[in-house]
């Protein structure tokens, strides 16, 4: 009645759709192909008029389901890549001025052994508790560290103010040796801000005083030279007066004013006896006048030399 060949004819599936094939599509979705085979066979048995399915149509339908509407294998790769979500970092980071810091810390072998020994002695179950205990015990050391940092920052800021005040000072008075030493001290780090400023002011005041003394000495020497070169110094009376005044300057402040007055009176009397008129002196006494002038010039030169020595000593 029934033809055995009709029931024993199974649809032949091409080797490309075999679940053991080497193609990428079949190897990824082998279970779907087996179910598809089961549907095809069951439909063949149940249908009164079974349809002969061609392998090309079966493969195209499967490829359309897997690859999308376009049948592009790149779409399959994109869909698989979208499904793999990247792993998120479960450990939150701590934002610090130098950048974000990870809460996880990697310890060296020696420190890790010491740390876990301490944790076992304390009986804590978490490392964070051990670190909290260590931080609480070292509060005083942390305070000292903060104070030392603040003091160092204040000291580093103070020399800049001192340097500005030193640079704003009068530069012409820094030429002396003591002025250079004072500036050298002020250029270093100021341990006490106000003390360094006071020292700089004192050094500048001393330099000004020394400069004033030098100018006074130079003016005195200049005046003496001008008086020596004047034409009226040929007068004998002026010569004797200048001689007595220079003897007073050379002898110093220890000479007595009364003795000098007596000498000047005696000189005037001699001049009246020997020279009755101011300009009517006789040619016989001309040699004496030249002697007086030579003595005056020699004494003035001695005075200049003494003043120069006094200047270099100071």
From Swiss-Prot:
Main function: Transcription regulator involved in the dorsovental asymmetry of flowers. Promotes dorsal identity.
InterPro entries documented for this protein: CYC/TB1_R_domain, TF_TCP_subgr, Transcription_factor_TCP
R domain ranges (all copies): 201-218
Keyword Transcription attached: yes
The organism of origin for this protein: Antirrhinum majus (Garden snapdragon)
Main location: nucleus
GO molecular function: DNA-binding transcription factor activity; sequence-specific DNA binding
Phenotype seen when the gene is deleted: Petals are more symmetrical than in the wild type.
Primary gene name: DICH
Name of the protein: Transcription factor DICHOTOMA
Domain TCP: start-end pairs: 87-145
């Amino acid at each position: 009645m029934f033809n055995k060949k009709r029931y024993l004819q199974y649809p032949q599936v091409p080797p490309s759709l075999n679940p053991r094939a080497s193609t990428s599509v079949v190897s990824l979705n082998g279970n779907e192909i087996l179910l598809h085979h089961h549907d095809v066979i069951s439909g063949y048995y149940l249908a009164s008029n079974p349809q002969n399915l061609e392998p090309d149509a079966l493969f195209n339908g499967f490829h359309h389901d897997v690859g999308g509407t376009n049948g592009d294998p790149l779409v399959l790769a994109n869909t698989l890549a979208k499904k793999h979500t990247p792993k998120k970092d479960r450990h939150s980071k701590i934002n610090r001025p130098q950048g974000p810091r990870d809460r996880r810390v990697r310890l060296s072998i020696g420190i890790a052994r010491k740390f876990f020994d301490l944790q076992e002695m304390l009986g804590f179950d978490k490392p964070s508790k051990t670190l909290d205990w260590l931080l609480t015990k070292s509060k005083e050391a942390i305070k000292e560290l903060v104070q030392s940092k603040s003091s160092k920052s204040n000291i580093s800021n103070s020399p800049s103010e001192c340097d500005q005040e030193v640079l704003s000072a009068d530069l012409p008075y820094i030429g002396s040796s003591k002025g250079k030493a004072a500036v050298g001290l002020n250029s270093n780090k100021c341990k006490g801000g106000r003390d360094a400023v006071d020292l700089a002011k004192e050094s500048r005041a001393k330099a000004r005083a020394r400069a004033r003394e030098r100018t006074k000495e130079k003016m005195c020497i200049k005046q003496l030279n001008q008086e020596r070169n004047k034409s009226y110094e040929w007068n004998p009376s002026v010569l004797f007066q200048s001689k007595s005044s220079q003897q007073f300057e050379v002898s110093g402040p220890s000479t007595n004013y009364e003795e000098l007055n007596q000498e000047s009176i005696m000189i005037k009397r001699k001049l009246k006896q020997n020279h009755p008129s101011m300009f009517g002196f006789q040619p016989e006494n001309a040699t004496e006048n030249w002697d007086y002038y030579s003595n005056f010039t020699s004494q003035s030169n001695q005075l200049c030399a003494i003043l120069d020595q006094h200047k270099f000593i100071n």
